[in-house]
Regions:
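Short, small-residue-biased leader/transition segments that mark boundaries at the very start
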Residues: 1-2
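Mid-domain Rossmann-like dinucleotide-binding core that forms the NAD(H)/NADP(H) cofactor-binding site
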Residues: 24-100
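Glycine-rich phosphate-binding loop and adjacent beta-alpha segment
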Residues: 126-192, 228
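C-terminal hydrophobic helical "lid"/dimerization subdomain
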Residues: 177-229
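Short amphipathic alpha-helix with an adjacent loop that forms part of the alpha/beta core around
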Residues: 103-114
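Structured surface patches comprising rigid loops and adjacent beta-strands/short helices at the edges
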Residues: 5-13, 17
């Protein structure tokens, strides 16, 4: 039997009602998506406030965020550069799929049409700046990733004229009580309804091909590696 000793604050007990496959399929992506939603709700986000937009929608964090938000009663808009995945995104719970190509990111206004009560951003850069300019008053953005850029060129207008909140989601430094609560909810009211559909199981020897797909931007959802296959 193989084992490794790690510091106690690195690990969280698997919650009751969750199996090993679900825990690995959720992984850091699922935890991060759920943490973002928990923090947004703590900041006042509720389904009645308006729709939530999710960028990087076909990725692991985006896919799980769409599924969980939909299950919690939110109207979800999926923002993607992969228009051919619209069917997949709607199956996860997106009420609308918006093409990233439809945005004119070269002319981002300090304030644009207010559209979103919440936003989960996996891209950074111009998309995050556009999101900030299009939030409803009192809206909340969860900044998770930098798949497009780690830079952010925006104005203070959304924050001081619409009261928009920008939350940074750091999944690696969450206090243990909050980590336990997030995982508890992932096994309960925030359990994704389509985890199996968004997850592929691969043998270890298949990983090089999967990595190639990731580098080409062709991957979607989650991958679980079966070391026994």
């Amino acid at each position: 039997m193989l084992f490794r000793s790690v510091p106690a604050d690195w690990v969280v007990p698997m919650p009751k009602g969750m199996n090993l496959f679900e825990a690995m399929a959720l992984g850091t992506a699922g935890y991060t998506a759920a943490l973002a939603i928990v923090r947004m709700e703590a900041n006042g986000l509720a389904p009645a406030n308006g729709p939530v937009i999710v960028s990087g929608a076909t990725g692991g964090v985006g896919s799980i965020a769409i599924d969980v938000l939909s299950r919690l009663g939110y109207r979800v808009v999926a923002l993607t550069g992969k228009e051919n995945e619209a069917g997949y995104l709607k199956k996860l719970g997106a009420g609308e799929v918006m093409s990233r190509k439809s945005l004119d990111l070269s002319k981002i206004k300090p304030l644009d049409k207010a559209s979103w009560a919440g936003a989960v951003d996996n891209l950074g850069g111009e998309v995050l700046a556009w999101m900030a300019s299009t939030m409803l008053p009192g809206g909340t953005i969860a900044s998770i990733g930098l798949a497009a850029s780690m830079n952010l060129n925006t104005s203070v207008a959304p924050f001081i004229l619409r009261g928009v909140s920008l939350l940074g989601i750091d999944s690696g430094a969450t206090p243990m009580p909050l980590r336990r609560e997030v995982w508890r909810r992932l096994a309960g009211d925030m359990r994704p309804a389509h985890l199996e559909e968004m997850t592929r199981t691969l043998a270890f020897d298949d990983l090089p091909r999967a990595f190639d797909g990731l580098l080409k931007g062709a991957a979607r959802g989650r991958i679980v590696v079966d070391l026994a296959a």
